[in-house]
Amino acid sequence: MIHAGNAITVQMLSDGIAEFRFDLQGESVNKFNRATIEDFQAAIEAVKNHPEVKGLIVTSAKSTFIVGADITEFGQNFAQGEKAIVEWALPVHDIFNSFEDLDIPKVAAINGMALGGGFEMCLVCDYRVMSDQAQVGLPEIKLGIFPGFGGTVRLSRLIGIDNAVEWIAMAAPKKPAAALKDGAVDAVVSADKLQEAAIDLVKQALAGRVDWKAKRQEKLNPVKLNPLEQMMAFNTAKGAVLAKANPAQYPAPKLMLDSLQAGASLGRDEALKVETEGFAKAAITPQAEALIGLFLNDQIIKKTSKKHEKGAHPVNQAAVLGAGIMGGGIAYQAASKGTPIIMKDIGNPQLALGMQEANGLLTKQVERKKLTPAKMGETLARIRPTLSYDEFKEVDIVIEAVTENPKIKEAVLADTEAKVRDNTIIASNTSTISITRLAKALKRPENFVGMHFFNPVHMMPLVEVIRGEQTSEEAVATTVVLAQKMGKTPIVVNDCPGFLVNRVLFPYFGAFDLLLKDGADFQQIDKVMEKFGWPMGPAYLMDVVGIDTGVHGAEVMAEGFPDRMKPDYKGSIQTMYEAKRLGQKNDVGFYKYELDKKGKKAKTVDSTAYEVIAPVVTSEKREFDAQEIIDRMMLALCNETVRCLEDNIVATPAEADMAMIMGIGFPPFRGGPCRYIDQTGVAEYVALCNKYAHLGKAYEAPQLLRDMAENNKKFYG
């Protein structure tokens, strides 16, 4: 044994070839943390001290190769400032360089996921052989940073500027065929032939059949383009990347491009210094803090959800009641992830609509070559449309998705309970009606739970799992595990009107309505909030949701929270509803809708909308300062999020923030309401609440925030 460390072992195989094996002890995956980097340095020194080593294959003992840097650990460095990040990163480059510079050929044998720093490790090797089951990539842009272990420098020299920019900016893992085509790997083989192929490539290098030194030299030299070619390549890349990523919202892509361009004409060592400086600039941005926070929050939620597996009972057969767009979407989602599902309704036209929804979604998958026609057939076969309860004795969980009307739901739920086994879980897809209230119609309320999908089901990642007063932990656990199996992110919340997401969303709509009353222009509000980072402004969002749906939800919320959600005036949303302007569903709302060339509804300005709401605008119309619009909209939303934490509706800031991002499109680069309050400064945020408190209770700072401000506390750290 040449080296035996906690993260790496090095041992001779044969013919002067040694195996440099990553196997981080006590972890299920390999990752670059401080311990791994220290061991990496020690292992390199050990190889240097063993002249009998003539070549290396780099392998992993795990099912993945290396999944990247330990962001939990390294993220702590980012709070230390730009200079400290550079001082931390440059010695890491020295270690990677010393491995690259070993005067022997090295081949990475990529058996599984090689992401971020893991793929940067592969790039340090002279050759890369990849299993046909593996994936490689540089996902750091999703975290508000970019590759910082030499990825921008080495990849651009290996595969060219245009390809490297696409790999880094898109941040998506690459399958073997794509990696081979672009030249990021040198061979793709079956998993069982991987080590043999890597050893064979080292032997070819040692025998002089491949020029490994010339191959390495490409990575040490400047990019092979003259200044004019470089300028053209970067201008094209900037146009493509910055059209998708506004630097004011997502600065990392532009910082990456600037670093790449500045380092392209330099040799490796100087280019790495440029990369490090750019990386440090990205790492200290509030966007990086927010996006890294989201990644960590996602890990927390996955761990929380995993804990439910022990308490769940298996779901071998599901059912959905109500076969409209929602029911069809739920059936599609379950069936496409392998769970057989019965879809019941009271009439054939409704069943046809549900099957049409599932069929349409699957057809699109086939057209995009993401699914074969045979797999589509298998998926459709898992959906059994029916008008009867005959097969419901087989069902482990029933998801009710009928009209959002308490009396109808209560009747359907009671009827269903009589047709299923005593241990069958019944879940309601209600968006606002109290689970505790609906449970009163049932004999076994402990088996009843909320399972709130968001529309469209196939696109929206969040499922709220709602615990009523009598809901058992088994019912919660079973529903959480099913949601995960369906490819969704479940967040468990306690029961209240609107649950978590809608309870928070309606004060946001209330703030919008109040701004209109005070003379703001809804188009200006939409533009300001979209520039702030929302995918659409509140007027457009209300049209998409449906103004009738919004009015109904507002009534439920006003009944539940009259002190801050029951307006003492008639607003524009109610007025639109009374004028039968329902939004996209009937083509007129705040905007007018017409089909574009692709057959999608496109919004246009409709002057009639202003005439409709004019009677309820009590102040003279004026142009508002953008920051006032932002403050009034965001305070109402963030305050209600904090109240949900105070009331134990949601357990943690991490879950609250993720729910808002996945459920209503809160700008990811701002990290969620709790992160937004932290980055504003809790004391400063409370002062803003005080400034706008005259607008009503929705603007009053919750006691939790006042206590946090007094004690200099934050939600994170």
Swiss-Prot record:
What keywords are annotated for this sequence in UniProt?
A: Fatty acid metabolism, Isomerase, Lipid degradation, Lipid metabolism, Lyase, Multifunctional enzyme, NAD, Oxidoreductase
Q: Which NCBIfam families does the UniProt entry name for this protein? A: FadB, PRK11730.1
Q: Which family does it belong to?
A: In the N-terminal section; belongs to the enoyl-CoA hydratase/isomerase family.
Q: Which GO terms describe its biological process?
A: fatty acid beta-oxidation
Q: Can you tell me which residues the record assigns to a coiled coil?
A: none
Q: Which residues bind substrate?
A: D298, N502
Marked site: Important for catalytic activity: E120, E140
Q: What is its EC number?
A: 4.2.1.17, 5.1.2.3, 5.3.3.8, 1.1.1.35
Region annotated 3-hydroxyacyl-CoA dehydrogenase sits at 313-717
Write out the residues that bind NAD(+).
M326, D345, V402, T403, E404, K409, S431, N455
Query: What InterPro entries does UniProt report for this protein, alphabetically?
Result: 3-OHacyl-CoA_DH_CS, 3-OHacyl-CoA_DH_NAD-bd, 3HC_DH_C, 6-PGluconate_DH-like_C_sf, ClpP/crotonase-like_dom_sf, Enoyl-CoA_hyd/isom_CS, Enoyl-CoA_hydra/iso, FA_oxidation_alpha_subunit
Q: Name one GO molecular function term.
A: 3-hydroxybutyryl-CoA epimerase activity
Residue ranges of the region described as Enoyl-CoA hydratase/isomerase: 1-190
**Active site (catalytic residues):** H452
In terms of PANTHER family, this protein maps to: TRIFUNCTIONAL ENZYME SUBUNIT ALPHA, TRIFUNCTIONAL ENZYME SUBUNIT ALPHA, MITOCHONDRIAL
An annotated GO cellular component: fatty acid beta-oxidation multienzyme complex
Protein name as catalogued: Fatty acid oxidation complex subunit alpha
